[in-house]
Amino acid sequence: ITAGFISSSANTVYVKKGDVMVFPR
């Protein structure tokens, strides 16, 4: 899985090497 950012109205999800990190806004 390539690193990337998925933006949503609730939070930002950071995906890197299969790991998913959620950053609340």
From Swiss-Prot:
This is Germin-like protein. Belongs to the germin family.
